[in-house]
Amino acid sequence: MSADTDRTAPPVEILLVEDNLGDARLTREALKEGKVYNNLHWVKDGVEALDFLHKRGKYKDSPKPDIILLDLNLPKKDGREVLQEIKSDSRLMRIPVVVLTTSKAEEDVLKTYTLHANCYVTKPVDLEQFIKVVQSIDNFWLTVVTLPNGK
């Protein structure tokens, strides 16, 4: 995190749902440089994501995330299914979900917005651009936007 990060405020809880270890590491590094103190929780598939959100198993003490970064192409349970479950659950539906995926397919964009994703971002393949995209998400969603207090 940067030196100007406000550590007196409670950290923003971020759930990253990403099966690619490299992308997860890059996301973590980019968020460390962000302006907002945050806790990044990383799960590798859709089943784990729902366990985290519903506080099941090893996630029984997990915090409710303030924002979710969701990949679409996940093992075990697809990101679209995860998004549908989040947005149909009254306890979870107000959590902003940022779809962060490699897919540029128009049907994926349309489907995720139909399922009430809050935004759709295509991951750049270029390393520096990827970091800039994550930092832009951080800046917009954690600095500019006022999120509902879900605590």
Segments from the language model and where they lie:
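Non-catalytic signal-transmission and effector/linker regions of two-component phosphorelay proteins
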Residues: 1-16, 20-41, 47-50, 54, ...
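Negatively charged, flexible loop motifs adjacent to catalytic sites
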Residues: 20-23, 75, 91, 103-107
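Conserved phosphotransfer cores of two-component systems
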Residues: 57-63, 87-94, 115
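Active-site residues of response regulator receiver
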Residues: 71, 101
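Hydrophobic residue at a beta-alpha junction
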Residues: 74-77, 86
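Short, glycine/charged-rich "phosphate-handling" switch motifs in NTP-dependent
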Residues: 118
